Amino acid sequence: MAFLLRAVPRLQGPAAWRRPLQQLWCRAGQGDSIRWVGSRSPPSQEKPPGTETEKFHTIYRFNAIRALGFLSRLKLAQTAVTVVALPPGFYCYSQGLMTLSSLGLMSGIASFALVMLCWMSHFFRRLVGILYVNESGTLLRVAHLTFWGWRQDTYCAVSDMIPLSESEERVQDVFVRIQQYSGKQTFYLTLRYGRILDRDRFSQVFGTLATLKNSK
């Protein structure tokens, strides 16, 4: 996974990624607010009332999340093709048009594709793409992926977030867990490959980075 994160930003020709990803996330208006472009809006979990008019500041961004969303949807399509091909394979075997070893190979590929899809989706759904904090610093908005590879916003109270200084996480690791006292959600962010855009607001939520690096 770390190799994939290093490779994504080095891919030549950003236009090659931009074309299939233009319907993912794009900037709307001024500032760092991100809106969904497409036929439907992304679902939000437990969206507090009044957030439509509240101003949010971007404090963290992981640019490779767009490529991972595209990869997730590509993997979903590939898995669907392999699974759909199984019934015709069984029919061909029953008619003597396919050997048992070929059918077993096809079934193995489909099973492996399903396992990989479940693993990738489980991780990608918890990988943070963008973090926002409202003006008063009381509400955290987490932009991450759904099972289908589309964007989803989850709202968390800042008071419910466990600071990294109180957790056993090492900020030097590739992925760092961010958890809630209530245990509702667990997300992962990468301080190594992501960018902290507002250190002051980030520190108000997760603790001062200088202190964290010295304590780990």
UniProtKB/Swiss-Prot annotation:
Residue numbers on the Mitochondrial intermembrane membrane side: 92-103
Entry membrane topology: Multi-pass membrane protein
Predominant location category: mitochondrion
Localization annotation: Mitochondrion inner membrane
GO-annotated cellular components: mitochondrial inner membrane; mitochondrion
Membrane-side (Mitochondrial matrix) residue stretches: 1-68, 125-216
Keyword match Metal-binding: no
InterPro entries registered for this protein in UniProt: Tmem186
Transmembrane segments: 69-91, 104-124
Assigned keywords, A-Z: Membrane, Mitochondrion, Mitochondrion inner membrane, Transmembrane, Transmembrane helix
GO BP annotation list: mitochondrial respiratory chain complex I assembly
Similarity-based family: Belongs to the TMEM186 family.
Quaternary structure, from the entry: Part of the mitochondrial complex I assembly/MCIA complex that comprises at least the core subunits TMEM126B, NDUFAF1, ECSIT and ACAD9 and complement subunits such as COA1 and TMEM186. Interacts with MT-ND3.
Role description: As part of the MCIA complex, required for efficient assembly of the mitochondrial complex I.
Name listed for the protein in its UniProt record: Transmembrane protein 186
Originating gene: Tmem186
